[in-house]
UniProtKB/Swiss-Prot annotation:
Encoding gene, per UniProt annotation: upp
KW ATP-binding (keyword) present: no
Recorded catalytic activity of this chain's protein: UMP + diphosphate = 5-phospho-alpha-D-ribose 1-diphosphate + uracil
Note describing how the cofactor binds: Binds 1 Mg(2+) ion per subunit. The magnesium is bound as Mg-PRPP.
Protein name as catalogued: Uracil phosphoribosyltransferase
Residue numbers binding uracil: 194, 199-201
Gene3D superfamilies: 3.40.50.2020
Protein purpose: Catalyzes the conversion of uracil and 5-phospho-alpha-D-ribose 1-diphosphate (PRPP) to UMP and diphosphate.
Species in which this protein is naturally found: Lachnoclostridium phytofermentans (strain ATCC 700394 / DSM 18823 / ISDg) (Clostridium phytofermentans)
GO biological process assignments: UMP salvage; uracil salvage
């Protein structure tokens, strides 16, 4: 079964608390998505492989560490995942970015793919799939399945908020994918939304309804 890391860092919990508030403005919510994503990514990237490299300091030569190969790729699930990617790129600006477009059928709650664009060398890269909400698990499962069909094996999934139902389904479908979660909430409601959650992340990021 995959490893699941639920964040307990005070900064993450504080920022998610602000995001939950219905009075939080669109701009503040958008900024917080990027900030929390960056903090979660910090933990998710903890075990990236390192290699030695010799450099010259102003005084002498030194052996330093660098991420081996530097082959990272962030894959946001459109559209809400885009601002999570922005936060991650603040830490690793040279990472490549792929995009997967999925929307949820409001009757079946199942994801429907409408777009996929990935770097040509994606199978050689460490892939970080990002989506703010892990609700039913359908979008995350579909996105990861799509990546695996393209020969990609090194995949991690990052989200801000998860429901137990969605996490369970994701683990059952992809037990080899490690999952990093900002907060694990109580449950889903009848419409498939996370409770207490923070509303529709995409709408709150973009100021739409």
């Amino acid at each position: 079964m995959s490893n699941v890391c639920i964040m307990d860092h005070p900064l993450i919990q504080h920022k998610i608390g602000i995001m939950r508030m219905k009075t939080t403005s669109t701009k503040e919510f958008r900024d917080l998505v990027a900030e929390v994503a960056m903090l979660i990514y910090y933990e998710a990237s903890r075990n990236l492989p390192l290699a030695d490299k010799e450099v010259e300091t102003p005084l002498t030569k030194a052996i330093v560490k660098e991420i081996e190969g530097k082959k990272l790729c962030v894959v946001p699930i459109l559209r809400a995942g885009m601002h999570m990617a922005d936060g991650i790129l603040n830490l690793t600006p040279n990472a490549k970015v792929g995009h997967i477009g999925l929307y949820r059928n409001e009757e079946t709650l199942e994801p429907v793919e409408y777009f996929c664009k990935l770097p040509s060398d994606a199978p050689d890269r460490e892939i970080f799939v990002v989506d703010p909400m892990l609700a039913t698990g359908g979008s995350a499962i579909a996105a990861i399945t799509l990546l695996k069909r393209r020969g990609i094996e090194k995949i991690r999934f990052l989200c801000l908020i998860a429901a137990p139902e969605g996490l369970k389904k994701l683990q059952e479908a992809h037990p080899d994918v490690d999952v990093f979660i900002g907060a694990l909430d109580e449950r889903l409601n009848e419409q498939g939304y996370i409770l207490p959650g923070l509303g529709d992340a995409g709408d709150r990021i973009y100021g739409t309804k």
